[in-house]
A protein has these predicted regions:
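Conserved catalytic core of sirtuin-type NAD+-dependent deacylases
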Residues: 1-163
Length: 163
């Protein structure tokens, strides 16, 4: 049986990760235009880098919740499970899911500032080393940025999600 699971912030909130829109969410402490847009990156890449470094450190302390584990268990029982998530964390993968499509990017990955969706520029940060610094460069020589789909950017994984 093929099962498609769509998840969002509520799943990761159960693991203790901060959400963006809750009453005490991240958007209450940060202006979305400052940390989640190409324009914010152009104005202050250090602020954006620090913001996502903090998100990565938070993720390193988190563990998959029961929901993540139940989805992975379906796969272990032999079902074809495709997870389509709006979350940028890797908690589905940590729980054991192997077919995860991240619509909005992946927090533990970085990419080129000039060509953020070029597969040759995307890399995974080393385990246990979540921080990126100004001066850390992508293969094309540009500043590394988070591999996150920011507001105003196209969602490259939307076509595969529809399939």
């Amino acid at each position: 049986m093929r099962i498609v699971v769509l998840t969002g912030a509520g799943m990761s909130a159960e693991s203790g990760l901060s959400t963006f829109r809750d009453s005490d969410g991240l958007w209450n402490n940060y202006n979305v235009e400052d940390v989640a847009t190409p324009e914010g990156w152009a104005r202050d890449p250090k602020l954006v880098t620090d913001f996502y470094n903090a998100r990565r450190r938070e993720l390193l302390a988190a563990k998959p919740c029961e929901g993540h584990r139940l989805v992975a268990e379906l796969e272990r029982k032999g079902h074809q499970v495709d997870v389509i998530t709006q979350n940028i964390d890797n908690l589905h993968e940590q729980a054991g899911s192997t077919h995860v499509l991240h619509l909005h990017g992946e927090l533990m990955k970085v990419t080129s500032s000039l060509a953020p969706n070029d597969p040759s520029q995307i890399s995974t940060l080393p385990a246990g080393h979540p921080d990126v610094h100004i001066g850390d460069l992508a293969p094309d020589g540009s500043q590394l940025r988070p591999f996150i789909v920011w507001f105003g950017e196209p969602v490259p994984q939307i076509a595969p999600a529809i399939e």
